[in-house]
């Protein structure tokens, strides 16, 4: 079985989404805290990286990233790599997953897809989809 990890950052107590991700048996959750994250943050199954854990891991990197930003998740990516992750998914801590989340992955599979090429300097890939509700990240 593949070694699958879910990475997110948070400043909140565990949300409904976090509880659902934390209870997935075929994924392991890593939550990266920030200075605003409650100090008593706790997961049943997953790994919580406190600000202190991050600073102890690599103070220079912590200082370079800064606080109160999503880039703190890099510590989660490093931890997953250290734990020999085969697949890593990044999520938001407030987006509750559908029941089929993480199932039927296309990783390492051949799939048909549309390919777009342009000579323009900038290309908006969402403009060529049928998904007008998507937003740029």
PLM features: residue spans?
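Active-site-proximal specificity loops/subdomain of glycosyltransferases
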Residues: 37-84, 99-113
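Short aromatic/hydrophobic "clamp" motif used to bind/position activated sugar donors
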Residues: 88
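Surface-exposed, flexible loop/turn segments at secondary-structure boundaries
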Residues: 12-14, 37, 96
